[in-house]
Structure formats: C-alpha cells, structure tokens
C-alpha cells in the first residue's frame, strides 16, 4: 500500500529496558542490526501495526510494554534504486514512518524471535541509546537520527548526550494529516564507553 507519492506507511520501534538501553536486532542470516519495523496494513492504525510488528519480530505482547511516546509526524526516507525490485521502480519511492518509544515492563525472557514462521531476527542485544546512529545504512540514517532525537527527551534517564549526531542531516517529514517502509550495515567497533550487551541467539 503506497501513498500517492510512492511512500509505504510503516512503523518503527525503539524498545527500552530498565537501563534505558535499546533493543537491537540482527537480521536473519545477515550481519546487519536494526530496530524492529514493519508496514502498516490497510485498515490498521499505526499503534495497531506497532503491536503486531512487536509480536511478529520480538515475540512481545501489549502487556509486556508501555508506550512512552511516538513521533509527532511521518518521517520519510527514500530508497536507492538498486535496493528496489525492478518491477517496483517508478512506483515505490521509500518509506514513511511513525516511530514509537516503548518501555519493556516484562523480562528479557519474554522475548521470542521465533514467534512466527517468518522471523526477521536471529539474535538480539541491548545497546546504548545513541550508538545505533553510527551503524545504520546511509539512506535510513537521517530518519533514525530524527526519531532518536525527537524521542530522547522522553527516555527515563538524565543527561543524554547526542555525541553521535551528524550536522547537516535532514529527513523528509510531513504532517500526519497530509496526503498522503531494509538493510543495515554495522561499520565496526563501537565506542569503548558505550553500553553493549552480548548478543542473544534465537532459540
């Protein structure tokens, strides 16, 4: 389902643990890590799509999390042509996303990467809030930056420092009411001061 400009409606999920670290999922059979995300189906609200994707990709139910905040407007990114199927070129332009910030109220053991027969991740870990900005594939980096920046003030931890943000980055954003979503490539070792847990494999 595309809007008139060729963007597919989508939701992104930033899931926090009690230490305000973020869930970071390793895409199945790749070396890429990213936040959970997925398309909004016809007739779904962004919140309904978020809870569906949360269960499909992470195995969590609504009673395992609490919604802290969401982005005010759609955040858009365009996908380069070489990432788009040939039959979709000229029609599909990219993704427009509403991002949700969630607090995990359950336990790590509640997560299940094989909740469906089409898993997205085969491992996961907890990561410092800002570190993912440095390991996101370039064409999605602006949206990650904007979502993390907009939602950072709601994170229940003092003294956030956006030391990884780059100047000059911009993402397309529109009011939610206007007319009118994958591949991430980690680039190497993370900052020595960053909080990173050991990857947990899917069982």
Curated annotation (Swiss-Prot):
Extent of Basic and acidic residues compositional bias: 173-185
MF terms (GO), sorted A to Z: mRNA 5'-diphosphatase activity
Gene Ontology, cellular component aspect: cytoplasm
Keywords: Hydrolase
GO biological-process terms attached to the record: mRNA catabolic process
Top-rank taxon: Bacteria
Listed InterPro entries: Nudix_hydrolase, NUDIX_hydrolase-like_dom_sf, NUDIX_hydrolase_CS, NUDIX_hydrolase_dom, RppH
Positions occupied by motif Nudix box: 38-59
EC nos: 3.6.1.-
Record Pfam families: NUDIX (PF00293)
The keyword Hydrolase is assigned to this record: yes
Cofactor annotation: a divalent metal cation
The protein's enzyme class: hydrolase
Residue ranges of every copy of the Nudix hydrolase domain listed in the record: 6-149
ATP-binding as UniProt keyword: no
Region (Disordered): 170-203
UniProt xrefs under PANTHER family: M7GPPPN-MRNA HYDROLASE
Described purpose of this protein according to its UniProt entry: Accelerates the degradation of transcripts by removing pyrophosphate from the 5'-end of triphosphorylated RNA, leading to a more labile monophosphorylated state that can stimulate subsequent ribonuclease cleavage.
Family recorded in the similarity comment: Belongs to the Nudix hydrolase family. RppH subfamily.
Name of this protein: RNA pyrophosphohydrolase
Organism: Leptothrix cholodnii (strain ATCC 51168 / LMG 8142 / SP-6)
């Amino acid at each position: 389902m595309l809007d008139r400009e060729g963007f597919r409606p989508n939701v992104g999920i930033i899931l926090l643990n009690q230490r305000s670290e973020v869930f970071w999922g390793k895409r199945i059979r790749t070396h890429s890590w990213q936040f959970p995300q997925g398309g909004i189906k016809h007739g779904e609200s962004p919140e309904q799509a978020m809870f569906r994707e949360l269960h499909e990709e992470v195995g969590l139910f609504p009673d395992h999390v609490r919604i802290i905040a969401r982005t005010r407007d759609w955040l858009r990114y365009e996908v380069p042509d070489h990432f788009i199927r040939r039959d979709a070129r000229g029609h599909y332009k990219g993704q427009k996303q509403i991002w949700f910030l969630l607090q995990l109220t359950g336990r790590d053991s509640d997560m299940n990467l094989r909740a469906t027969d089409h898993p997205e991740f085969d491992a996961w870990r907890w990561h410092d809030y800002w570190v993912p900005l440095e390991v996101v594939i370039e064409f999605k980096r602006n949206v990650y930056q904007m979502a993390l920046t907009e939602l950072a003030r709601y994170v229940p931890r003092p003294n956030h420092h956006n030391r990884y943000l780059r100047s000059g980055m911009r993402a397309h954003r529109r009011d939610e009411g206007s007319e009118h979503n994958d591949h991430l490539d980690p680039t190497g070792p993370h900052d020595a001061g960053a909080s990173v847990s050991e990857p947990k494999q899917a069982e």
